[in-house]
């Protein structure tokens, strides 16, 4: 423990008022056990996310792995990219929803500048492989990560052998839009409906 790592009571009270106490209580980005993991913002935890989660839980059970999720928040202390969209849930609500979804480990982190500038392969190597010991990785088809979101499913497919994990890609779910057309279920679509 270092003095510069300490937090003032007034800062904690302010975080409680903002519904962001979990930003002080987050666990270290490290897992003692090998994991079946998914990562992403998972804003609102909708039915599309739940399809990813159920696939992950099945993989965790099949291979005897710890089920884990790495998610990110864009609170006002975060480094964020040009387009900041309002979140569907406060950080504490988000953490609770993920924990209640059934994950054994929930890692919820602010999107810092260093994380946002990390190359996609560095993210896979240092975070997924070294820190979180990922053996089974489950993502959606539109997965993006690393600097400018340059990492994608194609890159994960190329890196899975090098970093000793198996990738499972879950297809999107669709619903009928207002015009009768098929629309992918996403946090952006839900946010749009809430704005109307």
Question: What are the roles of these predicted feature ranges?
Answer:
Residues 1-196:
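Nucleotidyltransferase catalytic core that binds NTPs
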């Amino acid at each position: 423990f270092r003095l510069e790592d300490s937090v003032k009571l007034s800062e904690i009270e302010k975080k409680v008022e903002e519904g962001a106490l979990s930003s002080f209580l987050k666990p270290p980005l490290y897992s003692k056990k090998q994991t079946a993991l998914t990562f992403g913002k998972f804003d609102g935890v909708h039915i599309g996310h739940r399809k990813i989660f159920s696939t992950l839980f099945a993989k965790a059970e099949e291979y005897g792995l710890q089920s884990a999720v790495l998610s990110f928040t864009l609170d006002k202390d975060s480094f964020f990219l040009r387009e900041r969209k309002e979140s569907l849930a406060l950080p504490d609500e988000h953490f609770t929803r993920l924990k209640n979804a059934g994950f054994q480990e929930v890692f919820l982190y602010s999107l810092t500048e260093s994380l946002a500038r990390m190359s996609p392969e560095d993210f896979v190597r240092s975070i997924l492989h070294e820190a979180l010991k990922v053996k089974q990785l489950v993502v959606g088809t539109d997965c993006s990560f690393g600097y400018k979101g340059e990492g994608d499913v194609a890159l994960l497919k190329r890196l899975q052998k090098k970093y000793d994990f198996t990738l499972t890609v879950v297809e999107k779910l669709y619903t009928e839009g207002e015009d009768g057309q098929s629309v992918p279920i996403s946090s952006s679509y839900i946010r749009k409906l809430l704005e109307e």
